């Protein structure tokens, strides 16, 4: 026990959109906070996986790139006098400690140790890696297979692009290539009959003249010929499509934070269960954003930011333990 360590009102775990905004808004509530981020940069999935993806549900913007949202959140945070952010920081352990009859969380990291009165988990899906393209349970590796859009988008100019997947990211990337006038030669291939995306973005696929192949599975990837062979799951009809690049959007495989104290938090579908005030079942621990499970809650940047405000509002109004 070290009584000389600094005590923060709030420790924010994770530097995605929700975490950055929580760090900023903590100043508004006169709470001194520290944000811990494992990577060397802020932004989470929007910066890591889809920096050029357009967002259509962010206030004051008809459309805005996710990376630009993150940049604005970071700039807003930098204007706060008491902003405290630690990058490249691994949390080694979190334990309960009692200092002067007050229960605190002791954080031990690869850089330093400190105390916190409250915790906000803004860790998203944890550390994540993209789900690889597999054929017959064998992962396919190729320089022509991409899992995120290369920022040097000139390499895609007027190229033949195949997008694999049927969720938001796959549908939005397919539209992105056409709408940004990068290339008009785009096809999207999905193993199911229906997309898992907004009706607005799905309608854009037809408006953008994107070739759509629903209910198809991948049966062959030929790197030398640059062709992808697909088979309809019902008719078993095969078709070979040429490509220059294949963009795989099969989602992510996450590795949650493995800390004994945090492992005691109730979870559903791998996410922290919260109440209306973002509280978990563990005293003084809150969770926001993609890290949480709440009935009918959309996982969007604006939702994560709103949840940051809700958690901090509750913390500021309830200074005592709950």
UniProtKB/Swiss-Prot annotation:
The keyword Repressor does not apply. Its EC number is 1.18.1.2. It catalyses: 2 reduced [2Fe-2S]-[ferredoxin] + NADP(+) + H(+) = 2 oxidized [2Fe-2S]-[ferredoxin] + NADPH. Binds 1 FAD per subunit. FAD binds at residues 37, 45, 50, 91, 128, 290. Coiled coil: none annotated. One of its GO terms (molecular function) is flavin adenine dinucleotide binding. Its cofactor is FAD. It holds the Pfam family Pyr_redox_2. Keywords: FAD, Flavoprotein, NADP, Oxidoreductase. InterPro entries: FAD/NAD-bd_sf (IPR036188), FAD/NAD-binding_dom (IPR023753), Fd--NADP_Rdtase_type_2 (IPR022890), Ferredoxin-NADP_redctase_2 (IPR050097). Homodimer. Belongs to the ferredoxin--NADP reductase type 2 family. PANTHER family: THIOREDOXIN REDUCTASE 1-RELATED-RELATED (PTHR48105). This is Ferredoxin--NADP reductase. It comes from Malacoplasma penetrans (strain HF-2).
């Amino acid at each position: 026990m070290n009584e000389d360590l600094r005590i923060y009102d709030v420790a924010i775990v994770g530097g995605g959109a929700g975490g950055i905004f929580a760090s900023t808004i903590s100043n508004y509530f006169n709470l001194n906070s520290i944000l811990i981020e494992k990577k060397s940069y802020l932004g989470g999935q929007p910066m890591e996986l889809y920096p050029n993806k357009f967002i259509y549900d962010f206030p004051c913007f008809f459309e805005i790139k996710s990376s630009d949202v993150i940049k604005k959140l970071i700039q807003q945070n930098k204007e706060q006098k008491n902003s405290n952010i630690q990058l490249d920081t691994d949390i080694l352990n979190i334990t309960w400690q009692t200092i002067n009859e007050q229960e605190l969380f002791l954080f031990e990291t690869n850089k330093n140790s400190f105390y916190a009165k409250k915790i906000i988990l803004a860790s998203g899906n944890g550390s994540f890696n993209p789900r690889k393209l597999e054929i017959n349970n064998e992962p396919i590796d190729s320089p022509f297979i991409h899992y995120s859009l290369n920022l040097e988008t000139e390499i895609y100019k007027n190229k033949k692009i195949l997008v694999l997947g049927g969720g938001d990211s796959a549908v939005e990337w397919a539209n992105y290539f056409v709408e940004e006038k990068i290339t008009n030669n785009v096809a999207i291939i999905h193993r199911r009959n229906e997309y898992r995306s907004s009706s607005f973005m799905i309608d854009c696929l037809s408006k953008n003249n994107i070739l759509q192949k629903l209910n198809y599975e991948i049966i062959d990837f030929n790197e030398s010929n640059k062709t992808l062979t697909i088979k309809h799951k019902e008719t078993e009809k095969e078709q070979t499509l040429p490509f220059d690049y294949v963009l795989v959007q099969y989602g992510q495989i996450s590795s949650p934070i493995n800390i004994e104290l945090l492992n005691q938090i109730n979870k559903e579908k791998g996410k922290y269960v919260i109440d209306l005030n973002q509280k978990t079942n563990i005293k003084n621990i809150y969770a926001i954003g993609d890290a949480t499970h709440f009935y009918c809650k959309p996982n969007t940047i604006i939702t994560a930011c709103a949840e940051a405000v809700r958690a901090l509002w509750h913390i500021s109004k309830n200074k005592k333990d709950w």
